[in-house]
């Protein structure tokens, strides 16, 4: 008898169960694990039920939501949560990014809204970056039953920690030196991993050179067989992938159609690189070695049999791959015959190019006594042979002409691109490893100064580059932008050359200290007078150590000695570096040894510690001044004891390395944390308690630190690969690697984080990996309104305190575009009264009121956006205007200033309080508190609270 679970299976489920056994072994190694997440809509449904229950509005919820939650086997209506959100008439409040500036401004807004009776009407409290600071303070106060946002002790704690990163300023302050020591410790560990890895790569050419010059003549036949075997495997893999990925499903009937499924199942270009390009590069390196040794042996020319073998190899692999994939090849005999002819011609071209390489090698071999001949062969041989395959691809496309489909041409074109990448990478590696130290001889007297100056210059350039033209409004061809683009390249090149030079000096020190005789010239080797001088770099005027012929000769002799007689030393160094790299990569957590924990601990001490300090419960360590009980799990806020709004902490999911063409400008998406669930549209969501370490799930401190991780190598649309390299190497890293909701939460941290560190280094974080890179929410949307639009809030109060001295309002503009594209929602708002400023830089209004068109055909579903902008209209209190008179940039002082004194703190707080009161405080006596309603909003829209310089009200 079948079990109940078996009887309820759908036909699709039965089909999946039948094939699951066959795919089990394949999935383990090649296929992604089945998604463990749920859609965002299901997470929102849980939030709405909690809001309805807390506010007493649960009877208004759409019954379809209740039914769906009661019967898990019934699929809920896809729009049921939207109907529920509309009926609940949700109120959302948002705090924008902007560091401590935004936090203090939004504190004033909070206090004003509470005084007006509006705060208790808020259902969602959404924050980004600096707005998250004060969001966490408010949540901690509500959790600890602090009755008012005006609580003197809680607010006083914030004032005393206005310099939250280093409360005690000064050169000899322990706080200041702690910043330096934490950064230095973490950077040294991180750099040890990266430098050892780079050194490993730079040692590889020396092993290749040893194989190139010590190839036993007795094994030449075996080497030729191995070479053609590797090339045959590589070509066959390319063609199998080509046919399988471009043939129709009904055509894939050959014997390899099923057995090569793992080959196709790899995501992206993984199959091509693992099974085709890596063997091809290895085969070409071996081929170059054979050509060099044949040239050294004195053979006049390559045997003619190689021409036949090259053509036969190409034809055989083509035919075998074609037949193995498409069983109906008999009906395509004409096309197959034409392809065979093309394959033969391509094989002949490859032989001709190989013969050209052989002739060049013969010339170099005559003067290799010792000299750069063998090293030139290593530098040019394999890259040129790999590039020759690209030329064969070009010839093949041209000969097939109209007979080749566009899809096939595109496939071959992309293959040629990868061949170019691999060819250039191998060439650059050999050039840096071998020729880099040689060129440093000419720079010997000022290389140290250049390195120090270059490091300082590129560090400054990295900070400049963080101010992207997308938001700064500056000319992208300005000097700063050009410097930011060039300096990271210069530093990266300098770093690689310095590591290469260090390796060279370390390996050749023994040669120069001992009387090692120079290698004797080989019999029949010509030694023209200028053979060594031809390899030297150009003379640099003004240097005290000119590169002489004798210096170049010594260099090549030492290099040849270390790569031949002392190859064991090279091997032991390689092993030692590998051990160091592996151990550190295993033990050094890429999250815990970034600057994020330092940042998080100080945010927690300032903003979350305030509530416990107000209650007299905070007991900090007398030495460090930290109390790690200040922080608590975000998931705790869904418990019955908490009666505040549902917090949404917004971060940016970096998708720089993703393949979605629609995200090429954004290069990030929204990733949110709430007490109920966390995730994104791309990854789905999981219960928040399953994120982070420990039973309580991810903490609020970690969430707000991630939401405020502005300085990160991957920064959404701000990301630049060269700046990412610079910031990662110098450990300017505040972002967080967290497990994707797609995968089970059995492990939150990557045991081997080195792979993800490389993604950070090259700026290629994506959304398909097990671990995702989250950074500042402002790298996607800086107002925090995006997720409230997704939840269809009826009333949204948006506080914008981002740095915007020119009133560009890029945050609002980006929000409008994203909502129109992603949700098909239009936001209609006129901000001209805020933008228009007089000679004193005073705006005509502090805020603007707009409509949110959730449904263009149903105006009853419209929402309303109240946009509060940090601005001055001239009606502010005297202390605010006095601070403005002394600080012209107020209220848009740089976000880099995270050290607020009392005057600065109080000025921003009072400004936020003033703007919120002027926007919402009604003129009619006896009508307070304000109740958000359509009637009240329409009253404003019809001029009931028109803007005026005296009142500083809303523009409508």
PLM segments and residue spans:
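Catalytic domains of lipid- and phosphate-ester/thioester hydrolases
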Residues: 2-956
């Amino acid at each position: 008898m079948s079990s109940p679970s078996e009887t309820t299976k759908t036909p699709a489920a039965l089909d999946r169960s039948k094939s699951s056994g066959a795919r089990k072994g394949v999935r383990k190694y090649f296929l992604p694990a089945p998604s463990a997440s749920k859609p965002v809509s299901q997470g929102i449904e849980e939030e709405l039920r909690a809001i309805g229950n807390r506010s007493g509005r649960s009877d208004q919820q759409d019954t379809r939501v209740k039914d769906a939650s009661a019967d898990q086997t019934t699929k809920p209506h896809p729009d049921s949560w939207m109907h529920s959100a509309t009926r609940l008439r949700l109120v959302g409040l948002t705090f924008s990014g902007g560091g401590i500036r935004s936090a203090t401004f939004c504190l004033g807004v909070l206090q004003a809204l509470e005084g007006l009776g509006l705060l208790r009407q808020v259902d969602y409290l959404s924050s980004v970056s600096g707005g998250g600071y004060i969001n966490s303070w408010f949540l901690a106060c509500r959790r600890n039953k602090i009755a008012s946002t005006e609580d003197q002790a809680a607010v006083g704690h914030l004032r005393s920690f206005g310099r939250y990163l280093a409360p005690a300023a000064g050169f000899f302050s322990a706080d200041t030196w702690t910043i330096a020591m934490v950064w230095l410790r973490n950077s040294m560990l991180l750099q040890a991993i990266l430098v050892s890895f780079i050194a490993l790569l730079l040692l590889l050419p020396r092993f290749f050179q040893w194989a190139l010059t010590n190839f036993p003549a007795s094994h030449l036949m075996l080497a030729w067989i191995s070479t053609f075997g590797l090339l045959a495997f590589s070509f066959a893999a390319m063609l199998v992938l080509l046919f399988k990925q471009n043939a129709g499903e009904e055509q894939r009937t050959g014997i390899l159609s099923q057995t090569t499924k793992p080959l196709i199942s790899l995501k992206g270009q993984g199959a091509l690189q693992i099974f085709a390009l890596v063997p091809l590069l290895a085969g070409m390196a071996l081929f170059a070695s054979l050509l060099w040794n044949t040239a050294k042996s004195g053979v006049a020319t390559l045997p003619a049999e190689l021409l036949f073998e090259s053509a036969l190899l190409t034809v055989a692999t083509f035919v075998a791959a074609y037949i193995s994939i498409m069983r109906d090849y008999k009906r395509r005999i004409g096309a197959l015959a034409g392809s065979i002819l093309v394959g033969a011609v391509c094989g002949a071209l490859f032989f001709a190019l190989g013969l050209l390489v052989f002739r060049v090698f013969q010339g170099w071999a005559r003067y290799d006594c010792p000299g750069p001949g063998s090293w030139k062969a290593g530098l040019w041989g394999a890259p040129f042979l790999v590039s020759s395959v690209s030329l064969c691809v070009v010839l093949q496309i041209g000969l097939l002409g109209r007979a080749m489909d566009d899809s096939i041409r595109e496939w071959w074109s992309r293959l040629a691109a990868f061949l170019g990448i691999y060819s250039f990478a191998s060439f650059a590696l050999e050039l840096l490893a071998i020729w880099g130290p040689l060129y440093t001889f000419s720079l010997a007297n000022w290389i140290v100064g250049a390195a120090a100056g270059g490091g300082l210059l590129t560090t400054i350039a990295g900070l400049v580059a963080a101010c992207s033209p997308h938001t700064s409004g500056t000319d992208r061809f300005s000097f700063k932008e050009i410097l930011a683009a060039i300096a990271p390249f210069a530093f990266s090149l300098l770093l690689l050359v310095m590591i290469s030079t260090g390796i060279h000096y370390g390996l050749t020190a023994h040669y120069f200290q001992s009387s090692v005789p120079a290698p004797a010239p080989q019999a029949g080797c010509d030694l023209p007078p200028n053979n060594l001088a031809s390899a030297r770099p150009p003379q640099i005027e003004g240097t005290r150590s000119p590169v002489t012929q004798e210096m170049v000769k010594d260099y090549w002799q030492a290099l040849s000695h270390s790569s031949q007689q002392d190859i064991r030393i090279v091997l032991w160094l390689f092993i030692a570096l590998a051990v160091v790299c592996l151990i550190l990569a295993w033990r050094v957590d890429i999250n815990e040894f970034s600057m994020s924990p330092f940042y998080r601990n100080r945010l927690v001490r300032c903003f979350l510690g305030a509530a416990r300090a107000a209650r007299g419960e905070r007991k900090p360590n007398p030495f460090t001044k930290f109390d790690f009980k200040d922080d608590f799990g975000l998931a705790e806020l869904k418990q019955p004891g908490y009666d505040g709004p549902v917090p949404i902490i917004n971060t940016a999911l970096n998708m720089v390395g993703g393949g979605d063409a629609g995200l090429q400008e954004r290069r990030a998406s929204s990733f949110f944390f709430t007490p109920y669930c966390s995730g994104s549209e791309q990854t789905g969501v999981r219960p928040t308690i399953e994120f982070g370490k420990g039973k309580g799930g991810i903490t609020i401190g970690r969430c707000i630190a991630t939401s405020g991780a502005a300085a990160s190598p991957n920064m959404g649309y701000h990301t630049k690969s060269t700046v990412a390299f610079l910031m990662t190497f110098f450990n300017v890293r505040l972002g967080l690697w967290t497990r994707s909701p797609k995968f089970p939460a059995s492990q939150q941290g990557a045991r081997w984080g080195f792979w993800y560190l490389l993604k950070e280094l090259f700026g290629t974080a994506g959304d398909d990996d097990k671990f995702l890179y989250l950074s500042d929410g402002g790298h996607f949307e800086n107002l925090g309104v995006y997720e409230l639009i997704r939840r269809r809030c009826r009333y949204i109060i948006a506080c914008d305190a981002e740095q915007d001295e020119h009133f560009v309002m890029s945050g609002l503009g980006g929000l409008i575009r994203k909502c129109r594209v992603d949700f098909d929602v239009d936001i209609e708002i006129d901000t001209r009264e805020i933008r228009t400023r007089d000679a004193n830089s005073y705006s005509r209004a502090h805020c603007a009121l707009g409509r949110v068109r959730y449904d263009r055909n149903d105006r009853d579903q419209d929402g309303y956006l109240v946009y509060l902008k940090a601005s001055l209209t001239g009606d502010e209190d005297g202390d605010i205007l006095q601070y403005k008179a002394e600080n012209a940039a107020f209220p848009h002082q740089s976000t880099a200033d995270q050290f607020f004194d009392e005057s600065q703190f109080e000025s921003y707080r009072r400004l936020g309080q003033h703007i919120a009161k002027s926007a919402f405080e009604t003129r009619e006596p006896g009508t307070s508190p304000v109740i958000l309603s359509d009637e009240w909003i329409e009253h404003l829209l019809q001029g009931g609270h028109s803007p005026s310089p005296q009142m500083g009200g809303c523009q409508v």
